[in-house]
């Protein structure tokens, strides 16, 4: 199935029920036509980071099901899988073989060997200045010692967690692995590959090792050359200043809109629509929009769309207005690597306020691109403090495990019923043609009018909203589709 211009659900294999069969059942029985695609967060055997330390891409974790379950989903929904191009688990065949056989291993060039990497740069490298220059996710050099079976030791590049060992994407053996893995994913139904942490994949002396140009384009192009003949696309994942996703988009790739979450929060906290209007006018059509994902709410992504003062205001309001949102939940004491993300569900970030939350999703639907909705957001979920405290993992505040019974109950809540109705309409409306147009006006400081029109100008959807009063009306071709006055109440 090709990528469709329909809302995409982001979910773990065991978060809507216990496994992939349950996910499929939830979609068919409880969600219906509100969702057209599914981003299945990593479902392979993994040794950490909730699937993001994959040990074996050839298998589905048996706890979730098997490839037949994945392929069954792919018959009804377009699918996105994650490929962690930057790293792989210590339990992978590659690492274990290297550990056992050292320089006799076929995988001796699969990983980035720290000492060998710096030896090419000259004597006495790395210096402290070299290490300080690296864009790091921890407060020390990004290395991990490996002890080989022959008793010797050396350091491997290790950007993220202890289980996630960096791959040398320029080595022949890694290129072969990347090609066979991606081809296998498409064979099992992937229409879109999310390249996780790709900006860290290229390492180069005398750079910060993050989004290293021009080499990063070579890496992306190599992946595209593998996928294009298979009619699959790439979605590179990067949390950074909006100018970098713009560059990626200019190269013809899908991108994420990670600026929208914070910009929308600012709009609904302040009641002012000017910055949202500015961003909607700037945004590309070939993108997937988000308000929430499996990670926290990105702050850095909105820089220069919002001023520093506006970002500070929105961040502080998030802690004031948000329900059960505390600064400590996004700190090192809750195992957070990224200080530029705030951990909360989007619903709780808006104070569990149904009107504000539904309006945030209305803004997302009218934004350029295809909307992605995280499973907790689809069910307007509140912060899961019990899971957070039992695991001391900050991001788990937004990773509730729903039983089938919970899902059936949650979809009956008015806010969820209205969201599902909104998405179902969006999926079928021709006005949201990605080849079409968007116009944005702000008649007053607190109001915004967004018009989406298809390429041939035959279909038009108009949103009129007041961010201060949290009211809105959607009109399609002269007919009111939904408004604050005609919502499902019970």
Curated annotation (Swiss-Prot):
- State the active site: 196 (nucleophile), 237 (proton donor)
Its Enzyme Commission number(s) read 2.4.1.7
Q: What class of enzyme is it?
A: transferase
Q: Which Pfam families match?
A: Alpha-amylase (PF00128)
**Which InterPro entries does the entry link to?**
Glyco_hydro_13_cat_dom, Glycoside_hydrolase_SF, O16G_dom_2, Sucrose_GGa_phosphorylase-rel, Sucrose_phospho
Which residues does the annotation say bind sucrose? Answer: 49, 87, 194-196, 237, 294-295, 338-341, 395
Reaction(s) catalysed by this chain's protein: sucrose + phosphate = D-fructose + alpha-D-glucose 1-phosphate
A GO BP entry: carbohydrate metabolic process
GO MF entries: sucrose phosphorylase activity
* Xref: NCBIfam families: sucrose_gtfA (TIGR03852)
What is the annotated quaternary arrangement, including any partners? Answer: Monomer.
Q: What is this protein called?
A: Sucrose phosphorylase
Identify the species of origin. Leuconostoc mesenteroides
Q: What is the lineage of its organism?
A: Bacteria, Bacillati, Bacillota, Bacilli, Lactobacillales
């Amino acid at each position: 199935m090709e990528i469709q211009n329909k809302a995409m659900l982001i979910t773990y294999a065991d978060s809507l029920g216990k496994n992939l069969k349950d996910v499929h059942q939830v979609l068919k029985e409880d969600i219906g036509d509100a969702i057209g695609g599914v981003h299945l967060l990593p479902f392979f055997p993994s040794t950490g980071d909730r699937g993001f330390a994959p040990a074996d891409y050839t298998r589905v974790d048996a706890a979730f099901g098997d490839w037949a379950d994945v392929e069954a989903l792919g018959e009804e929904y377009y699918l996105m899988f994650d490929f962690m191009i930057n790293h792989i688990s210590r339990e992978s065949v590659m690492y274990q073989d290297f550990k056992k056989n050292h320089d006799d291993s076929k995988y001796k060039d699969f990983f980035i060997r720290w000492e060998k990497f710096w030896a090419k740069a000259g004597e006495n490298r790395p210096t402290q200045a070299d290490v300080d220059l690296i864009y790091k996710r921890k407060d020390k050099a990004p290395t991990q010692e490996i002890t080989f079976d022959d008793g010797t030791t050396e350091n491997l590049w290790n950007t993220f967690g202890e289980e996630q060992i960096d791959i040398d994407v320029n080595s022949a053996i890694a290129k072969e692995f990347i090609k066979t893995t991606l081809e296998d994913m498409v064979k099992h139904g992937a229409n879109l590959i999310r390249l996780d942490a790709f900006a860290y994949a290229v390492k180069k002396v005398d750079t910060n090792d993050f989004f290293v140009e021009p080499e990063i384009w070579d890496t992306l192009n190599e992946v595209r050359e593998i996928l294009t003949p298979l009619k699959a696309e790439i979605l590179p994942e990067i949390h950074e200043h909006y100018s970098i996703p713009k560059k990626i988009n200019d190269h013809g790739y899908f991108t994420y809109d990670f600026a929208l979450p914070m910009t929308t929060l600012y709009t609904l906290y302040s009641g002012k629509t000017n910055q949202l209007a500015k961003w909607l006018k700037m945004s590309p059509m070939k993108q997937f929009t988000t308000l929430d994902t499996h990670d926290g709410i990105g702050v850095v992504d909105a820089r220069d769309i919002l001023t520093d003062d506006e970002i500070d205001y929105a961040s502080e309001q998030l802690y004031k207005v948000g329900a059960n949102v505390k600064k400590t939940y996004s700190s090192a004491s809750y195992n957070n690597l990224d200080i530029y993300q705030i951990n909360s569900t989007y619903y709780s970030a808006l104070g569990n306020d149904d009107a504000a939350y539904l309006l945030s999703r209305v803004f997302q639907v009218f934004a350029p691109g295809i909307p992605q909705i995280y499973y907790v957001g689809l069910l307007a979920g509140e912060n899961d403090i019990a899971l957070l405290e039992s695991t001391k993992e900050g991001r788990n505040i937004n990773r509730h495990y729903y039983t089938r019974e919970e899902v059936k109950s949650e979809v009956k809540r008015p806010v969820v019923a209205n969201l599902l109705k909104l998405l179902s309409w969006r999926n079928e409306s021709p006005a949201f043609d990605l080849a079409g147009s968007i116009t944005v006006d702000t008649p007053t400081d607190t109001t915004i009018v967004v018009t989406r029109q298809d390429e041939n100008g035959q279909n038009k959807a108009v949103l009129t909203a007041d961010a201060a009063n949290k009211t809105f009306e959607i009109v399609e071709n002269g007919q009111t589709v939904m408004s604050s006055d005609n919502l499902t109440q019970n």
